[in-house]
Amino acid sequence: MGAGKFLGYLIFPRGIEANPDQIKAVNRLRLPSNPKEVQVLTGMLAALNRFISKFADRCRPFYQLLKKWKGFQWDEECDKAFRDLKEYLMQASMLTTSDSGEDLFMYLSVSDHAVSAVLLKDRGVQQPVYYISKTLVDAETRYLPLEKLVLSLVHATRQLPHYFQAHTVFVLTKYPLQSLLKRLDFTAE
């Protein structure tokens, strides 16, 4: 099978790459000066989110800027996020394919405002298969880190059910997730 373009992605036998034209379009953008331009930016980035580690955290300043009650105030945090994302996209790695039945690994990450996961395969070198991320709603931001971690895992299983059905996925984290998931009684007594 050769290389080709499908649904805006470049497909190769060894994996999937973001369309370089989409990356160039983001890199050509100047600093947004109004909410409409921020919406254009976030739309362009959303099309590339599967290639961006911790997407929700990286784009949070832009989404905060779009909140109606806050008003439009492009600040240093937005400027840094904009520059960092452009730089990140220039170095974006190819997402590799996985063979049926191959063991996969998932790292979960939590922050104050988002949960993220990366699905990897490991053949001596870890290679990303898929990145996912979720911005936390107000109530979720008050979860304990372990609860956010479980939320991250639930979100990952909902976003990537085909990987969990076709592969053994080892979830890697610094938290004692296994002991929590084995508990039979989840009531607070």
Regions found by a protein language model. Name each.
Residues G124-L151, H155, K174-D185:
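A short, polar/acidic, helix/strand-boundary loop motif
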Residues L120-Q127, Q159-H167:
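Secondary-structure transition/capping motifs at alpha-helix termini
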Residues P13-A18, K121-Y131:
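Flexible glycine/proline-rich, aromatic-decorated loop/lid segments
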Residues F105, T168-T173:
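Short glycine-rich phosphate-binding loop at a beta-alpha junction
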Residues E102-V110:
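Two-metal-ion RNase H-like nuclease active-site motif
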Residues L45-L48, L146-A166:
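Metal-dependent nuclease catalytic cores in nucleic-acid-processing enzymes
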Residues V110-K121:
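Acidic, metal-ligating active-site segments
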Residues M1-D103, Y175-L177:
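C-terminal reverse transcriptase regions that engage the nucleic-acid substrate
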